[in-house]
Amino acid sequence: VYPAGERERLLRITGAADIKDCSQLLLDTACAWKRGTAEQKEALAKRYIALLSHLWEQGWAEGSSLGTTHHLGYAMRGLYPSVLLMRTVLESAGLMKKAADMLAWFSGRGRIFRREVRWESMDTLNTLLQGILYSILLEKDTGKQAAYLHTLRKWLNGILRPAPGLKGPFKVDGSAFHHAGHYPAYAMGGFQGLTPVIYALSGTEFQIDAEAFETVRKSLFMMRIYCNRYDWPVSMSARHP
């Protein structure tokens, strides 16, 4: 955390790169690798591993304390799908476990083991949930993978029931809470992060239960009522519609 008014000067002195830019570059490289020719793939794989290895060397690895002062979900969300796309390259290089452990750490996968949880931040659904799922899918031990998926299902069933008090993400009336109030702008991101995970788990023994699904469904359809193109009171839109 840079002192107020000193950020630009210190960045010039240190030559620091933003982790968000690095994360996006990893994803762009992985997408290009997926579509590339054999020759292009070889070069792109080397670039991907070089950048990821540099991040590890700088401390962006399992066990790091770099993310304890603030939420890193928005800055690092390009990382998670990039590792999934590059899994064969990482496996061949003997780096798969280190990459998977990195995903589990920075996505905060440990949260799914908390018991009797009835709420979760909308930010988690938006920026971390898919990373949690990817880290589980990269688990090579199928027994552990199944156990993690069952735990993920149980956790989702808890947090996707109507949340108590001013907690999020969803309420019994279909409103979507963040920052202790109804906040549609954050809800949109929450749905974008959550619904692909619900879809990925559907039709399997790990799919969410009917009550959790109905809570999400009701909140999504409620948007048709409270969204308005021209007139959104602050009480319905929080800081911005």
For the regions a language model picked out, list residue spans one by one.
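Aromatic-lined, polymer-binding surfaces characteristic
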Residues: 1-241
